[in-house]
Amino acid sequence: MRHQCRVPQLGRPADQRKAMLRALTTQLIREGRVTTTKARAKALRDEAERMITLAKDGSLASRRRAIGYIYDKQLVHALFDKAPTRYGERKGGYTRITRTVPRRGDNAEMAIIELV
């Protein structure tokens, strides 16, 4: 039984869930906004904010952790260059989740997650 497990399952095995969140995080950092389901957006928020916090730190160890998570190495370098100036005094809350209309096919709750 999954009593008090805080990780959202998202209907996938662990390896597929991790790959999906890595891909969504990479796309969010590249594009600035992603349209996805509400549950995925909430799970994505934790990962994206963790990567931005690493970028604000700016150390070599933080850069290596981000390179190990984000699929595009050049995107990591760009994030580490612009994050300290863009989010310097902000302590958290780097993303915003906005609910949109339900998906037409299965009526799933949709949301737009974007970088603030």
UniProtKB/Swiss-Prot annotation:
Give the keywords, sorted.
Ribonucleoprotein, Ribosomal protein
Q: Tell me which GO cellular component terms the UniProt record holds.
A: cytosolic large ribosomal subunit
> Which BP terms in the Gene Ontology apply to this protein?
translation
Pfam families in UniProt: Ribosomal_L17
Task: Name the domain of life.
Answer: Bacteria
Tell me the GO molecular function terms. Answer: structural constituent of ribosome
User: Keyword tRNA processing, does the record have it?
Assistant: no
Please give the PANTHER family that the UniProt record associates with this protein: LARGE RIBOSOMAL SUBUNIT PROTEIN BL17M (PTHR14413:SF16), RIBOSOMAL PROTEIN L17 (PTHR14413)
Entry similarity comment: Belongs to the bacterial ribosomal protein bL17 family.
Quaternary structure annotation from Swiss-Prot or TrEMBL: Part of the 50S ribosomal subunit. Contacts protein L32.
Protein name in the entry = Large ribosomal subunit protein bL17
What organism does this protein naturally occur in?
Synechococcus sp. (strain CC9902)
Taxonomic classification: Bacteria, Bacillati, Cyanobacteriota, Cyanophyceae, Synechococcales
